[in-house]
Curated annotation (Swiss-Prot):
This is Solute carrier family 22 member 2. The lineage of its organism: Eukaryota, Metazoa, Chordata, Craniata, Vertebrata. It comes from the Eukaryota. Glycans are attached at residues 71, 198. The gene is SLC22A2. Coiled coil: none annotated.
Length: 554
């Protein structure tokens, strides 16, 4: 009996139905962007200072300019290490009772300001921004700044749990059902987050979004690759990630137009309600139906695909079977990922690369909000370079191979991070160029690890290997907010130094992996172990063995 791939040979690998389905699912990929990196705008931390009762009235009475008000009433101005004092401390002065003058009002209290006692902010903060973010609304600064780290870590914890749990449910109950359920929950949680009355509820709804959003993105990825023919799977997989990049560009524009975080959150959530219409637009995966022995339903869907593509099914292709032959089933085990030396090495290197790809990708985006430039333009420019990154991958993986482009992309990302440390702030053009190179490098590395991970494991542990290794991506996402925001409190460029080290190490480790270009996917542990061996040498061994076997006959 024919397989799905056999029927797609007749009805079209990537014709009208597949293009329509790809467009619809690509919208989900683009809509996932605000959840993954929306922290840049939702959690933007503007310059701030303690709110001191009486200062505003005194400033108005004396006719101070904004600069004079800061100079007279805020500690730490001009000091190299005065950021903490300027943003988190205040003079312990009762501005309403001390009757200060308008010229150097603190001079009557102490001849030297350094002798005046300082205390923590007690009446909130004043933020230098026309809009709002979760930071400004819930005062997530100074002693409460860790709560911003937790906000982003919560969504990554959700990614970690949801990808495993909902991934299992999608294999058990079907792609379409799980996709629609994740869309509905995501839409509801996003709206509830936009109207959250306090930080705790906002955190809970963000965690719920994390539980379902990445899983929904992955289900969309699986669906489109299962609807197209074999020769198009790699291309549509990369283009599905390009749709995520389009979402980055749209997010920058929407965030610029809507500087208030609640309206921004509501706006980027509303498209998910439209995605519920996919119930009538996208069928279940025929490959999944066959795996569940629902061949009749799978055949009806293939007939629907043929009709959409303007084709007709030959009489000889009126039944379906699974692509895999029925035989002895091997039960995968976590120990299989570390039992043999080569697979153990592959597992360790892949886990590290998933972790570093997540840390560098999310970390570079988060660092944009702290670098002091135009956050909207910097975000937009850095997103643009993801397009050439995707097309470079398509152009090189089947010509040059996987290993060298992957290693170089990691090293470029690491070197760009290190170079950024030494670029002066006044060279804005050079700073943006270096940042874009780093972003392009880590984008290529991210997409390459997705591709190569599946090519290094034998069939019976391939899904398990991808699942376990890619889980380190979410662990990296959990760690990254604390890494970025805590290290910048020590030195603004310190996260870039850390990114440079882990990126360069990742590039070196990739060179220890085998090249998988032109190789069939390994079916057994033995074949996976022999991937490191050059094919030419392997042919020589077979040749010698045959000569020895023929020897006694001559």
């Amino acid at each position: 009996m024919p397989t799905v791939d056999d029927i797609l040979e007749q009805v079209g690998h990537f014709h009208f139905f597949q293009k329509q389905t790809f467009f619809l699912l690509a919208l989900i990929s683009a809509a996932f962007t605000p959840i993954y990196v929306g922290i840049v705008f939702l959690g933007f931390t503007p310059d701030h200072r303690c709110r001191s009762p009486g200062v505003a009235e005194l400033s108005q009475r004396c006719g101070w300019s904004p600069g004079e008000e800061l100079n007279y009433t805020v500690p730490g101005l001009g000091a190299a290490d005065g950021a903490f004092a300027r943003q988190c401390m205040r003079y312990e002065v009762d501005w309403n009772q001390s009757s200060p003058g308008c010229v150097d009002p603190l001079a009557s209290l102490a001849p030297n300001r350094s002798h005046l006692p300082l205390g923590p902010c007690q009446h909130g903060w004043v933020y230098d921004t026309p809009g709002s973010s979760i930071v400004t609304e819930f005062n997530l600064v100074c002693a409460r700044s860790w709560m911003l780290d937790l906000f982003q870590s919560a969504v990554n914890i959700g990614f970690f749990i949801g990808s495993v749990g909902i991934g299992y449910l999608a294999d058990r109950f079907g792609r379409k059902l799980c996709l629609l359920v994740t869309i509905l929950i995501n839409a509801a949680a996003g709206v509830l987050m936009a109207v959250s009355p306090n930080y705790t509820w906002m955190l809970i709804f963000r965690l719920i979004q994390g539980l379902v959003s990445k899983a929904g993105w992955l289900i969309g990825y699986i669906l489109i690759t299962e609807f197209v023919g074999l020769n198009y799977r790699r291309t549509v997989g990369i283009l599905y990630q390009v749709a995520f990049t389009v979402g980055l560009l749209v997010l920058a524009g929407v965030a610029y137009a809507l500087p208030r975080w609640r309206w921004l959150q509501l706006t980027v959530t509303l498209p998910y309600f439209c995605f519920l219409l996919y119930y009538w637009c996208i069928p279940e995966s025929p490959r999944w139906l066959i795996s569940q022995n629902k061949n009749a339903k799978a055949m009806r869907i293939m007939e629907h695909i043929a009709k959409k593509n303007g084709k007709s099914l030959p009489v000889s292709l009126q039944s379906l079977r699974a692509a895999e032959d029925v035989g002895e089933k091997l039960n995968p085990s976590f120990l299989d990922l570390v039992r043999t030396p080569q697979i153990r090495k592959h597992t360790c290197i892949l886990m590290y690369n998933w972790f570093t790809s997540s840390v560098l990708y999310q970390g570079l985006i988060m660092h944009l909000g702290l670098a002091g430039g135009d956050i909207y333009l910097d975000f937009f420019y850095s997103a643009l370079v993801e397009f050439p990154a995707a097309f470079l991958i398509i152009a090189t993986i089947d010509r040059v191979g996987r290993r060298y482009p992957w290693a170089v992309s990691n090293m470029v990302a690491g070197a760009a991070c290190l170079a950024s440390v030494f670029v002066p702030d006044d060279l804005q053009g050079l700073r943006i160029t270096v940042a874009c190179l780093g972003r392009m490098g880590i984008t290529m590395a991210y997409e390459m690890v997705c591709l190569v991970n599946a090519e290094l494991y034998p069939t019976f542990i391939r899904n398990l290997g991808v699942l376990v290794c890619s889980s380190l991506c979410d662990v990296g996402g959990i760690v990254t907010p604390f890494l970025v925001y805590r290290l910048t409190a020590i030195w603004l460029q310190l996260p870039l130094v850390v990114f440079a080290v882990v990126g360069l190490v990742a590039g070196g480790l990739v060179l220890m992996l085998p090249e998988t270009k032109g190789r069939t996917l390994p079916e057994t542990i033995e074949e996976a172990e022999n991937l490191q061996r050059p094919r030419k040498n392997r042919e020589k061994v077979i040749y010698v063995h045959v000569r020895k076997a023929d020897g006694p006959l001559t």
